[in-house]
Amino acid sequence: RTYDIGVVTDKSVKVKFNGKAVPNKNFEQYMDIYIGPKTETKRVYEIPHERWEIGACLSPLDEFTQVSYVNGINTCKGGKHIDFVLNQIVKKMIVYIEKKKKVKVKPATIKEQLMLFVNCVIENPSFDSQTKECMNTPQSRWGSKCEVSDKFIDKLAKMGVMESAIASNEIKAAKSAKKTDGRKTRNIRGVPKYMGANWAGGTKSKDCTLILCEGDSAKAGIVSGLSKEDRDKYGVFPLKGKLMNTLDANLNKINNNEEITNIKKILGLITGKTYTKEEALKQLRYGKLLFMTDQDLDGSHIKGLCINMFHSQWHDLVKIPNFLGFMNTPILKATKGKRTKSFYTDSAYKTWKQANNNGKGWKIKYYKGLGTSTAKEFKEYFAEKKVVMFKYNGETSDNAIDRVFNKTRADDRKDWLANYDKDAVLNPDNNKVSFEDFTDREMIHFSKYDCERSIPNLVDGWKTSLRKILYAAFKRNLISEIKVAQLAGYVSEHSGYHHGEASLNGGIVGMAQEFIGSNNINALLPLGQFGTRLKGGKDSASERYIFTKLNAITRAIYPKLDDDVLYYLDDDGLKVEPEYYAPIIPMILVNGGKGIGTGFSYEGLCYNPTQIIDCLKCKLKGKEYSGDIKPY
């Protein structure tokens, strides 16, 4: 208490203990009494206001503790002043950690890392008792305000509070993960839509195979194709869509993912456990895992995300031979009378087509979705069992998977896509494929397509879905107004659009918007409420109530004479939109755009069409443009 008097009284006051002078230290030096010198314990100190001094360090007790004074009174139980400073530190630290580390930390986790020092002067303070251990004066009556600076937070975070909070968060997440762990048992409950194998979880579980399929319709087809004997050995679980990328996700996010939690229960997986081959066969409810997805590019992505989940969370299972694999199903069939030929790649079909009179007399049916197959065809798939198992090749396989899913390796993905070969595909006759072959010959096609549909084409300025809309509008000769919802249906029918019409409606609305900040030249006309700049166009009316048609200027920019010389794409035998249009001015500059693909992203501003045209005229005449082209 003698040292306390020395720090809270005026420096002119001489303080003695048993006749020996006690040095009058300032508040920063006073902190040494509790936590030792700066060389021993790092701390942060600042004076945010002439009436306030604050300091903080890592708590030596692994729980929150504080030392505080109000007008020279030791408030050992804290009070409103401590709560005010602490809440600021905690809130700012949460934002700081999320920005720097992309990790969400709870306030209690930050608080338990801190030891807080506060010395303040409050006007007419009140306390909760006569011992004056806890100050309860409302903040509005303090006569001053303490604002914790960003510099204080930055120093405190780098001092070790951020690392300690993240470590504590991971420990709590690991404990939480244990609650979602699976175990080997004959019956499991609480997993909707899961159809288990009769032998799963029993003495013959090593002979069982779990099939992860894409959607409920795929599950229905697979179940219809299983024989009575197959029901003993095969379990089926439909995925709702694409799994999250678990490589960079924190444990809390993974624990809260219902899909992953269900897979853990079904297989009997334990978080963080390493499995040898013998342990996997003995402790898991299934001895093998197969993926059955649609034979399109998104299906390849789903397979890749599933592989990534096991590679990042249960790496040893990836190494086990014949544990992970997928079942090949035909991408198309050619039928002539009673004869049927199945093809598992487009290249195999094209080769056969060229050698057989261009397929004349054969009926072609595409099977890009598992839901296209009948129960009879699923029985054929399981009779043939064209199963391909993944093969692990050490660091080469690890690097291939990491390159695709590690968010920090965007530059590596750029180099990867720079070597893209559209003819490089997996051999459907192989029963084993390495993980690196899967990424380089199957996943890469999705990544290339992801860039094409997410990033505007440099030539015409359109993403794939918007180009389909423009193609459909030209094909329909859309000079009379039509409801946006009706146009979306027409686009789906005539351009091979395979995704939800909600995004298609949004694309049509976006192409027609003309408020400031949207399009400099809108390809479609907004006949109705298509949104305002107040909400960035998100406040448009329902697609059922608004109309649109081609803007008269659109056909001038994309001349009809060019239509016959464009290279048109093919989708399931249907002629669809061209690879790109050839506008007479660079629309990528006129309307700008943005998008994030695989490895690449783009964000471009809008520019004045008149200036762009003047610049082009100068270029055509061999002159230099003297104007200054600015965003417009």
Predicted segments, located by residue:
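Conserved phosphate-chemistry cores used by DNA topoisomerases
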Residues: R1-Y632
